[in-house]
Design a protein with these regions (language model features):
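Positively charged n-region of N-terminal signal peptides that target proteins for export
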Residues: 1-4
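Amphipathic beta-strand/beta-sheet edge segments enriched in Tyr/Trp
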Residues: 21-22, 92-158
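Residue position within the beta-strands of beta-propeller blades
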Residues: 111, 174-179
Length: 209
């Protein structure tokens, strides 16, 4: 996990000890778990800094979109419409009003915040059990700003594992052979991309295959 540091783990309590929510992936006809992915809050100074370096207007929202997309494509989770959220992201991260999240039928909630610390990207996130009104997990990461998508994948892995008991697969990369050029003179190149198709890069020039 080069250039990526897990700063701290506040706590992870086994769900069976508290009777918290779990996703049973062994059952057939599984109904996706309703989960609210709150946009990661960010202070104005950090927002301007990352907008300049990453060309992203709101990097906190971009990271939350990665998490939301990952959870949705897994088929096990149903990310809820953000327009229905009743609590501001920064307030929800500190102390969720669980009655508000219950009102929109969320069973789990992800909150977080982003900050520029010495030109590094620091991301904190928390996973909450809405039904039990308890925090299930809290983690923080510090990395170079360009790793923002990977942070989203790692957070999804942690959430997926916590709720299903299975290892996540979102922070993985795929190596494949890409072809281009006319049919009579195809060029094959070795390429790599994230599991969601982002960050596609060629590893060879086409002369090696």
């Amino acid at each position: 996990m080069r250039n990526l540091i897990i700063l701290f783990l506040i706590f992870i309590i086994p769900s069976k000890a508290l009777g918290l929510i779990e996703v049973d992936i062994t059952r057939g006809n599984l109904n996706p778990l309703p989960i609210a992915v709150s946009p990661l809050s960010i202070d104005d100074e950090s927002k301007k800094s990352f907008e300049k370096t990453l060309k992203k207007k709101d990097i906190g929202s971009e990271i939350s979109k990665v998490i939301e997309k990952n959870l949705k494509t897994s088929g096990l989770f149903n990310p809820l419409d953000k327009n229905a959220f009743l609590q501001a992201p920064d307030i929800a991260h500190l102390k969720p009003r669980f009655e508000d999240w219950n009102l929109i039928k969320a069973q789990a909630l992800i909150t977080g915040k982003v900050k520029n610390v010495d030109d590094k990207l620091r991301v904190e996130f928390r996973l909450w059990d809405v039904l039990a009104g308890k925090e299930m997990m809290a983690l923080a990461f510090t990395t170079v700003p360009n790793n923002w998508r990977r942070v989203g994948h790692i957070i999804t892995d942690k959430v997926y594992e916590r709720l299903t008991g299975e290892k996540g697969y979102f922070d993985t990369r795929i190596i494949y052979v890409a072809e281009e050029g006319p049919k009579t003179k195809r060029i094959k190149k070795l390429a790599i991309m994230d599991q969601d198709g982002a960050n596609n890069k060629f590893l060879t020039l086409g002369n090696e295959l």
